[in-house]
Amino acid sequence: MTSKLDWMRQQLYQMAEPCPEWWDFIKQNKIDVGAVDPHCGTIAVALCKSVETIDGDRLFEFSPNGIPCVVIEAICFRSENGNINPYTADLVAWPIHSPDELATALGAGDGCELLGAWSACRTDQTPLKVHPTPLAWLKTGCDGCVMLKPGVENWLHKAGGPFICGDAEQAREVCSMLGDQAPMHDVLIPQLRRAA
């Protein structure tokens, strides 16, 4: 029996041929496809529609009646026989011109809680960049992570900080997820400087 994720991945791979919208997206956002491929698998532009569940989660599906969306794979890692192996844990989609309208294939409780799981599992104390959207993450060559859905606080606790957030709102969200342990972690916001 094929799982929902396997079925949707098959659909994604069938639609993954570059189209004019894909080329425009890659070019306009200066995405290095070779650099991001190991971290997000396939990048496609496909017609999708999303629905909001009663608990506020957003799910998407491929639909000929949908709107053009960017779709990527959420890669996680599992340990098997002493080896760390990547696998696709979920699919993530957003309208091509609205990167903050995020939806996943599997929703809360299933799939992957964040993009950039390997970054969150780092062993040094370099700051973990927490990006506000998958697009912002892709533009950096997938440096850091993106919080996708509930359960991400476990990853944040494992990462241990310091964290660099894009803005004050995101920093507050990270602190909220860290709870009473937030003071033990540095949650930073880069200071923007005006060019002279």
Where are these regions (language model features)?
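Alpha-helix N-cap/helix-start capping motif
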Residues: C19-P20, P134, A168
